[in-house]
């Protein structure tokens, strides 16, 4: 039995932050009902690249859910959503602040009917304050939170991270908050509304950079692939490409000098202390690379690791997914998809550390648009006549009818 088995989640979110949150809950055993607005569904379904017509963006964050398609614009459609929510333990949403209240689905209204309900929300800038009504996506928040000012090279422009870290981190924060709220509900019998924003999530991830400013008033700047306060640390060129090297202690620094046959460096005043090495990092990098360029990155990596020095290659994604370590981690699992056949996916990285601890597992693929509409409505208490009427009125959509409705 998985930790969240028996917990029912109604996921009203779209795009990435909310769906990622609910996928984490689904991977841990929750029964997640993904409710998409008909007839077109989650906006991410239109975002490429596509695998035989299916968005890989959508596939990345909707595993282990059952999917229904409802026209929210119709009163009967909202009634369907309200009935599903009334039977749920958790509701996830990432609408603009105030939208849920306007639909009659705000936490105050829902919790008045069911005090045990837990709601998890993600907004762009928070539910209060002067920016509560601002629209925002990941890159907008990365810039506003200062993250882009820290990312990139000193002589280059501010740079976004290579993945949607604001969306993903806010999803993880809310998943954590939902689980804490469910645990608290066991003690008090009451649910609660937990939430975060892209802005808050990214500011929380500033970590030492944020503390440096709050404590010292220093405004950190971009340092490229170098560490702001440790040297040597970062990317170094070898004979056949770059590798990462991070000898962060004094003992590691001495071992590095011995391994590279540079015994004079520790006595050089420019490199005798970490602060001195940071001040002269460019000169130090040139000296280290003069040795590193004599061998390839794989050979150097093995030599460094054998000497107890943290190092590793800088892989492309084909190298990542072909790496045997990934297979040992069990991070990629196959799942049967209704139209794509066998689909490989990266799973939630919470493998059990013992045989008696169940790891998250893939139960079913990301749903087709409206794949489980009829089944879910039957479970919710709708009889076949009512379901047929909703289908005929284009209030709900079942998978085999969605393509026709969109045309």
PLM regions with names:
Residues 58, 223-228, 233-234, 340-347, ...:
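Short Gly/Pro-enriched turn/cap motifs at secondary-structure boundaries
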Residues 1-187, 368, 374-407:
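N-terminal helix-loop segment corresponding to the beta1-alpha1 unit
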Residues 336-389:
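Flexible, small-/acidic-enriched active-site or ligand-binding loops
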Residues 305-329:
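Conserved PLP cofactor-binding pocket of PLP-dependent enzymes
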Residues 171-191, 204-216, 257-264:
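Oxidoreductase and adenylate-handling cofactor-binding alpha/beta cores
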Residues 39, 125-126, 198-203, 240-242, ...:
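Glycine-rich beta-alpha junction loops
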Residues 231-307, 311:
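Aromatic-enriched alpha-helical interface/lid elements that frame and gate functional surfaces
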Residues 127, 155-165, 186-202, 221-228, ...:
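Conserved Rossmann-fold dehydrogenase catalytic segment
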């Amino acid at each position: 039995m998985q930790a969240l088995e028996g917990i029912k989640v109604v996921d009203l979110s779209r795009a990435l932050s909310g769906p990622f949150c609910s996928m984490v809950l689904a991977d841990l055993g929750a029964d997640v009902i993904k409710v998409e607005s008909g007839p077109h569904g989650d906006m991410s379904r239109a975002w490429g690249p596509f695998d035989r017509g299916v968005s890989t963006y959508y596939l990345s964050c909707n595993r282990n859910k059952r999917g229904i398609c409802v026209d929210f614009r119709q009163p009967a459609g909202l009634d369907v959503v309200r009935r599903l929510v009334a039977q749920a333990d958790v509701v996830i949403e990432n609408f603009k602040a105030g939208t849920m209240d306007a639909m009659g689905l705000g936490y105050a209204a829902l919790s008045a009917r069911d005090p045990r309900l837990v709601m998890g929300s993600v907004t762009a800038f928070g539910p209060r304050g002067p920016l509560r009504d601002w629209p925002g996506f990941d890159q907008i928040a990365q810039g506003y939170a200062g993250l882009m000012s820290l990312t990139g090279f000193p002589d280059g422009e501010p740079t976004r991270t290579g993945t949607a870290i604001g969306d993903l981190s806010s999803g993880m924060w809310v998943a954590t908050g939902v689980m804490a709220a469910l645990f608290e509900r066991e003690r008090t019998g009451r649910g609660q509304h937990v939430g975060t924003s892209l802005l808050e999530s990214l500011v929380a991830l500033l970590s030492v950079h944020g503390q440096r400013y709050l404590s010292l008033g220093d405004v950190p700047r971009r340092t490229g692939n170098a560490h702001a306060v440790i040297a040597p640390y970062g990317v170094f060129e070898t004979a056949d490409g770059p590798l990462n090297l991070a000898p962060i202690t004094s003992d590691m620094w001495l071992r590095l000098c011995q391994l590279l046959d540079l015994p004079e460096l520790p006595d050089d005043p420019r490199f005798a202390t970490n602060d001195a090495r940071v001040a002269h990092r460019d000169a130090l990098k040139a000296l280290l690379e003069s040795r590193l360029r004599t061998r390839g990155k794989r050979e150097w990596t093995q030599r460094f690791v054998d000497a107890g020095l943290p190092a590793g290659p800088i892989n492309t994604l084909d190298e990542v997914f072909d790496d045997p370590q990934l297979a040992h981690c069990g991070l990629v699992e196959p799942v049967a998809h209704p139209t794509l056949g066998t689909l490989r996916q990266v799973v939630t990285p919470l493998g059990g550390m013992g045989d008696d601890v169940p790891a998250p597992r893939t139960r079913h693929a990301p749903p087709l648009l409206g794949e489980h509409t009829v089944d879910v409505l039957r479970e919710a208490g709708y009889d076949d006549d009512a379901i047929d009427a909703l289908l005929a009125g284009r209030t709900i959509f079942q998978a085999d009818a969605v393509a026709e409705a969109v045309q």
